[in-house]
């Protein structure tokens, strides 16, 4: 039901729609090393990644198992290894590179009773402190 027009469905970020301001916030609150985030955002700008091209909450995603989604997983992991571990910065870039436009799951991901898909998600802190 969530994969009618695409192979991937995710939750929309509740506050922002762009990786560039998200990267600044990640640096400001020290969720990751600023040099990693700066290098990542500079690389994406050099690759002509557009502003306001979507930002997602990613504790869970719904997807089909296809060659493209398998490639997405490998490319996404490559970005996380090269740059920031903040997956929501790299995910939109990888989707864009592969021509994937995720559909949006209803509700919010990181709230109790915020959606009908995952009634409660357990939060784990996996931040690299700067």
Predicted regions and their residues:
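Glycosyltransferase catalytic domains, chiefly GT-A lineage
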Residues: 1-130
């Amino acid at each position: 039901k969530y994969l009618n027009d695409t192979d991937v469905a995710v939750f929309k970020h509740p506050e922002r729609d762009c990786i560039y301001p998200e990267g600044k916030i990640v640096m400001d609150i020290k969720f990751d090393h600023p040099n990693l985030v700066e290098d990542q955002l500079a690389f994406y700008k050099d690759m002509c990644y557009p502003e306001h091209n979507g930002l997602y909450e990613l504790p869970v995603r719904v997807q089909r198992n296809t060659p493209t989604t398998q490639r997405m997983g490998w490319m996404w992991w490559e970005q996380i290894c090269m740059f920031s571990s903040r997956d929501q910065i790299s995910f939109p870039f990888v989707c864009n590179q592969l021509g994937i436009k995720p559909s949006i799951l209803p509700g919010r991901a990181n709230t109790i009773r915020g959606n009908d898909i995952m009634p409660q998600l357990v939060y784990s802190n996996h931040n690299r402190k700067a």
